[in-house]
Design a protein with these regions (language model features):
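A positional "C-terminalness" feature that preferentially activates on distal terminal regions of long
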Residues: 245-246
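M16 family metallopeptidases and their MPP-like homologs
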Residues: 1, 19-28, 79-100, 108-215, ...
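Short amphipathic alpha-helices in soluble, non-transmembrane regions
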Residues: 36-44, 148-152, 249-250
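C-terminal structured domain segments
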Residues: 41, 49-53, 203-206, 220, ...
Length: 257
């Protein structure tokens, strides 16, 4: 068994660690480029050429399952998460989704989950891949928080704000987009954009959509949030009593020791 594992890992290494698969990311001034080039040439010389005529991207056939798990702990607070995806149902991403995060984080979710519900925190996001989530943490509630999440579309459908308040939401969103970054963070953002094929044009488009967001667009986004919630994906960690009281929400309940 040990010899077989070694053989498999050696074969895998020969496919992965080849010149054709090498990518290098550097965050530096021009003075840092020369040392990299010198060291990189030595590394490239030691890497073998690929034995494959054409490097193929792996095809994944993973089939996700709906877990909907509840985990019991000895603690007295809960962590409740709802997630889903809207792009799989044909809803395109819009920069207004980032404004939604600000609106919900500082208004509806803040008031309902933190102020009224007593949770230590709550957060949400709706990404460019269509993934959306709403999460509470150190929350005295479980089923009640899930009900708050379910009512987000209704809140958005009735959303209204004057020009001053709407501008505050937009400024709050832009402040997150324009957070000062360290050189390391700038480099990481750049490499992530390259790896995921995000262009400057896409970033600018998202920014323009944030700046032009209005109440009507926020109301229209209720459909996107409804689609995310329609997946019905939930996971929660909490006390035995709270998890049992909400057992109809879960496909499986387990105990965390």
């Amino acid at each position: 068994r040990k010899e077989n594992l070694i053989s498999v890992l050696q074969a895998l290494a020969k496919k992965v660690f080849v010149k054709e698969r090498l990518s290098v990311d550097l965050t530096s001034g021009k003075e840092g480029l020369k040392p990299l080039e010198n060291g990189l040439s030595r590394l490239i010389d030691r890497l073998p050429d690929s034995e494959e005529e054409k490097l193929l991207k792996p095809e994944y056939s993973m089939k996700p399952i709906v877990g909907n798990e509840g985990f019991k702990t000895a603690g007295k607070v809960q962590y409740v998460a709802r997630v889903g995806n809207s792009s799989e149902k044909g809803i395109a991403y819009n920069g207004v989704n980032k404004v939604l995060k600000t609106i919900l984080g500082y208004d509806y979710l803040w008031n309902e989950v933190r102020v009224k519900g007593g949770a230590y925190g709550v957060m949400c996001a709706f990404t460019d891949l269509g993934n959306g989530y709403m999460v509470s943490y150190r929350d005295p509630n479980l089923a009640e928080t899930n009900e708050v999440f379910e009512k987000v579309p209704a809140y958005l459908e009735a959303f209204d704000a004057d020009e001053r308040d709407m501008m505050k939401y937009i400024i709050g969103t832009v402040s997150e987009l324009d957070t000062p970054l360290t050189p390391r963070a700038e480099g990481r953002r750049s490499s992530q954009a390259w790896l995921t094929d995000i262009t400057f044009e896409q970033i600018q488009k998202e920014r323009d959509e944030v700046l032009s967001a209005d109440c009507e667009q926020v109301r229209e986004a209720a459909k996107m949030v409804s689609t995310v919630l329609s997946d019905g994906y939930i996971c929660a960690i909490g006390s035995e009593g709270k998890v049992e009281d909400a057992k109809e929400l879960f496909n499986e309940i387990r105990v965390l020791n």
